[in-house]
Amino acid sequence: MKLVTPSLFSTLLEKAAASPRRRSNFNLHEQSQDPIQRLFIAAKSDSYFRAHRHPDKWEFSIVVRGAFDVLTFDEVGVVTQRIRVGPDAEVYGFELPPNTFHAWVPVADDSVFFEVKQGPYDVVTAAQFAPWAPAESATEVPAFVQKLALAKIGESVA
């Protein structure tokens, strides 16, 4: 039996703090070829999740600690939905349909979510990054993160 414990979250958050990406994950599925992928993702508040979509695959997430703002976008980077997700928010989790551009914005420093999505996982095809969202290493990331933090439904982040 695989157990989800406070020490698991503590370990994930310690790894996130030490990671250049400021996040870490723990897979519950055994291998990348499993038909259902299940994982916990821990993030610090300064972690940048580049806007992306999963072609032909749905995604379900529930925030179990902290809080995130989750934004969805149209093809050109206009915000179509913005929700606060977390144990103390009005929304605990959500399911995204396939092919939906989305981004996570951590709003609490020690935040953890559980994600379930269709497998198998293929690093080449798992996610398509939004062309209007800067790559993680780009110098534009800090300004883009500020834009995400303030973006309202109907506004463009591109």
Regions found by a protein language model. Give the residues of each.
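Structural motif
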Residues: 47-48, 67-69, 110-112, 120
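Short acidic-glycine-tyrosine-enriched beta hairpin
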Residues: 74-102
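Conserved short histidine dyad/triad with adjacent acidic residue
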Residues: 40-56
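Glycine- and acidic-residue-biased ligand/ion/polar-headgroup-sensing regions
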Residues: 56-76
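Double-stranded beta-helix
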Residues: 78, 103-158
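Conserved hydrophobic/aromatic beta-strand scaffold that supports enzyme active sites
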Residues: 38-42, 60, 93-95, 115
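Short beta-strand His + acidic residue motifs that chelate non-heme Fe in jelly-roll/DSBH
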Residues: 51, 70-72, 94-96, 102-107, ...
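A short, N-terminal "cap"/entry segment at the start of jelly-roll beta-barrel domains
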Residues: 1-36, 81-87, 138-158
